[in-house]
Amino acid sequence: MKILLINGAQEFAHSQGKFNKTLHNVAKDTLIQLGHTVQETVVDEGYDENTEVEKILWANVIIYQWPGWWMGTPWKLKRYMDEVFTAGYGQLYANDGRSSKNPTQNYGKGGLLHEHRYMISCTWNAPAAAFEEVGNFFDGRGVDGTLLTFHKANQFLGMKPLPTFMVNDVIKNPKVDIAVCAYKDHLNDVFGSANA
């Protein structure tokens, strides 16, 4: 399988992006060991929009790695998506899916990447309970409900989601070794050996 790893972490204020870089490298090493072909982009290092469109077209799967900042992605990853997805007009998506005959239906169905998948791997200082418990901060919406707009941006291109991986409590109660092992297991479960 051809997999594009996009590291959306960035250095800003007290965040240095080290843990997300670690997880990005765990994914790269694990997937290569499983026999998959990997390309990568580190958003904070810069990118060429047209090259990124080609990478997305090349990939069967995109794995996004990023920290949860103010309930979403770091701004450079959002900018990446705005710039690269827009540059991909005609290749990543044809239109918004609607027709003039029925302009209220089929919005978001103009994507061209129907055979592609994407996966989110994200880190949060929030504990898992903040996402899962009704009455807690995210009111039981779970991580995927919290990330609805990120999912919809990828689904607008026609891609389908793979199971999300989330590491919680990364500042107040970090457990890096446990998280790394859990991520390796997740990658093995989702992707398995390329030769299987």
UniProtKB/Swiss-Prot annotation:
Any idea which UniProt keywords this protein has? FAD, Flavoprotein
**Which InterPro entries has this protein been placed in?**
Flavodoxin_fold (IPR003680), Flavoprotein-like_sf (IPR029039), NADPH-QR_MdaB (IPR052397)
Q: Which terms in the GO cellular component ontology are assigned? A: cytosol; nucleus
Required cofactor(s): FAD
List ligand-binding residues for FAD.
Answer: 15-22, 68-71, 107, 123-126
Question: For this protein, what is any one GO molecular function term?
Answer: catalytic activity
Superkingdom classification of source = Eukaryota
Q: Which PANTHER family match?
A: NADPH:QUINONE OXIDOREDUCTASE MDAB, PTHR46305
Into which family does the record put it?
Answer: Belongs to the oxidoreductase MdaB family.
Q: What name does the UniProt record give this protein? A: Uncharacterized protein C5H10.05c
